[in-house]
Structures are given as structure tokens and as C-alpha cells.
UniProtKB/Swiss-Prot annotation:
It comes from Pseudomonas savastanoi pv. phaseolicola (strain 1448A / Race 6). This is Probable RNA 2'-phosphotransferase. One of its GO terms (biological process) is tRNA splicing, via endonucleolytic cleavage and ligation. GO terms for molecular function: NAD+ poly-ADP-ribosyltransferase activity; tRNA 2'-phosphotransferase activity. Gene3D superfamilies: 3.20.170.30, RNA 2'-phosphotransferase, Tpt1/KptA family, N-terminal domain (1.10.10.970). The lineage of its organism: Bacteria, Pseudomonadati, Pseudomonadota, Gammaproteobacteria, Pseudomonadales. NCBIfam families: PRK00819.1-4.
Length: 188
């Protein structure tokens, strides 16, 4: 399978497992799990031709580790990023490292400077331990801006942090007082 085919399947999985399972009649449980065979059968019926081997390849090669297979390989879910109300994944609550990072685009900075980071249509704000990963996320939306998050201070103030299956840190919101701009976009 080539990269284009893997990317197409990955985008479909993200759409179904994070945002719109009902678009193909897929059912997710409260923790976001879907039966692998059911997902493949319904995707095939909607014109997406792939099998379990292709799905496994997408899961294994996805750089951001967006998907998780159950221990018995019978179920699949998105690691994080759900916007569907029926999914309320119970991620492990953990103490975060002192500093986490968030990548955004410069066009969102006015809003962030006013209200901090909010989850929007998702259940959580996504943070990472790696500044380069954060910058690559910011690049997807325009001129990237790197923000440092005072995770230690937030945690000590009682804010709950969770860690998804793929290592991404999740929090309900980040106040503007807990943010520091580390890298602004380079003017062209």
C-alpha cells in the first residue's frame, strides 16, 4: 500500500472514530471503541476498499499514533480528539511534566490572548511534551506559533491532566496566565 492510500484510510478513520461514526452507521461505545470487522464492512459498503491488513498497516505506521487497537485486535478507537458527545474516553489522569507545548497559528492569537486555550468542539485541549510536534501542528493552520504551558503550576492549582494512548496530554482548558509565547511566525 502506498502513502496516498494509507493517508486516505487514516483520514477516513479519523472522521469516523473522532467525529461522525453515524455517517456510515458505525456505533462507538462510551470509550470510543468500534468493532474492527464492523468498521471495515461499513467502510467497504460506502466505497472504501480496504481490509484488516491495510487497517493494521495504517495503525502501525501512523506517525502521530492516532489510533489504538484493543489487546485482542478486535476493536479500534481514536487515541484522542473526539468531538462526538457519546464518546467520553476515560484517559489516565497523570501528573504532567513541568512544561508542555501547544502549536497554533498566528491568526488564532488574538482569541488565545483573550480567553486562553479552549477545547472548542473537542473534549480537550491537546498538548505535547515535544515543541517540534507542537510546531508541526501549528503549521497545519497557517503561520505557526509555539506556546509553552505552565503545566506544573496548573497541576499544583488543581487542574486535572490526562494522557491519551498516544502520549498526547489532555486538559479541559489553559488560562492565558499559564501560557508563554516561545516562537512567533517569521515575517515573510
Amino acid at each position: 500500500m502506498n502513502k496516498k492510500q494509507r493517508d486516505e484510510i487514516s483520514k477516513l478513520l479519523s472522521y469516523l472514530l473522532r467525529h461522525a461514526p453515524e455517517s456510515m452507521g458505525l456505533t462507538l461505545d462510551r470509550d470510543g471503541w468500534s468493532e474492527v470487522d464492523d468498521l471495515i464492512r461499513k467502510a467497504n459498503a460506502h466505497g472504501y476498499a480496504f481490509d484488516r491488513q491495510a487497517l493494521n498497516e495504517v495503525v502501525e505506521t501512523n506517525e502521530k499514533k492516532r489510533f489504538t487497537l484493543s489487546e485482542d485486535d478486535q476493536r479500534i478507537r481514536a487515541a484522542q480528539g473526539h468531538s462526538t458527545v457519546q464518546v467520553q474516553v476515560q484517559h489516565a489522569e497523570k501528573e504532567p511534566p513541568a512544561t508542555l507545548y501547544h502549536g497554533t497559528a498566528s491568526r488564532f492569537m488574538t482569541s488565545i490572548e483573550t480567553q486562553g486555550l479552549i477545547a472548542g468542539s473537542r473534549h480537550h485541549v491537546h498538548l505535547t511534551e515535544d515543541p517540534e510536534t507542537a510546531m508541526s501542528v501549528g503549521k497545519r493552520y497557517g503561520q505557526p506559533v509555539l506556546l509553552a504551558v505552565d503545566a506544573k503550576g496548573m497541576f499544583e492549582a488543581g487542574v486535572r491532566f490526562f494522557q491519551a494512548d498516544n502520549g498526547i496530554w489532555l486538559v479541559k482548558a489553559v488560562s492565558r496566565d499559564s501560557l508563554t509565547v516561545l516562537r512567533l511566525p517569521i515575517p515573510e
